[in-house]
Amino acid sequence: MNNASALLQVQGLTFSHPGRPVFLDWSASVGAGATLVCGGESSGKTTLLRLLAAELPPSAGSLRLGQVVLADAPQAYRRQVFWADPRSPAMDALIVRAWLQGLPAQYSEWNAPALATHLDGFDLHPHLDKGFYMLSTGTRRKVLMAAALASGAPLTLTDEPVAGLDRASIRYLCQALADTAQAPDRALVVAHYEALDGVPWRAVIELPELD
């Protein structure tokens, strides 16, 4: 991809877990549309999303999202990113409806009609007044996906979105991703071990298994 057309540019990214290197001088350009990050369980997919979300600090390298360089303006960078780790316990005590109601203040391009559509499509209305700790794995991911798609964030990061989903929800998810991927100013980065049917993947980033 021509760097001039990339929404996200990553240069020389380096990161290690204690005693275990994960990325060494890794570079990539991500444009508008859907990008698949694929690899096995130990390939660093989730770690990469956390690095792109500025949740983990790299030991070297730079990230530029639009005109914003993470190292120069970390808060401005993070305001352009949607990332919610489905495995994190940090949201357990929150009520779904209250969490969703707080998101428009964080995302300037928040799309309320889109959220309403996704709440219907994922059949989430019975769960809006529950705490996140009460949600099944699949329902939790559906809530996060509805918010991610409605966020309007230039960089939207999603980790293993189909875990725990039934077939109808997977079909809806794939159609919603395909529709959202048409936006000319959004990069949807999805980490999964294989491509999802019906999603027009603009690019595929394959991560090797870590030794």
PLM feature segments, named:
Residues 53:
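Helix-to-loop junction immediately C-terminal to a conserved catalytic motif
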Residues 58-72, 76-77:
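Conserved ABC transporter NBD signature motif
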Residues 87-109, 114:
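Q-loop/switch helix immediately C-terminal to the Walker
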Residues 145:
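Hydrophobic anchor residue at the start of the ABC signature
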